[in-house]
Regions:
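N-terminal, charge-rich alpha-helical recognition modules
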Residues: 1-72
Length: 72
């Protein structure tokens, strides 16, 4: 499987957020996914919102959209 090229480097914690968010989509909130990925409880809500924002992290939002589209 070919590794995707992104506009910016996705960090391991961001990749973990993507995996958890897609696996728990509809069951867990984005904040819960961020905490499970390793973000601090005090900043998880903000980080989750930023990671899902197309303007701040287009690569992450696109990856999530592609993975969720594949689940249907």
């Amino acid at each position: 499987m070919e590794k995707k090229k992104y506009l910016t480097k996705i960090t391991p914690i961001q990749e973990k957020f993507i995996e958890i968010y897609c696996a728990k989509y509809g069951e867990w909130s984005a904040t819960q996914c961020a905490m499970a990925a390793g973000y601090a409880r005090s900043s998880a809500h903000t980080r989750a919102a930023e990671l899902l924002d197309w303007r701040k992290h287009p690569d992450i939002a696109m990856e999530i959209q592609e993975r969720l589209a594949g689940l249907r």
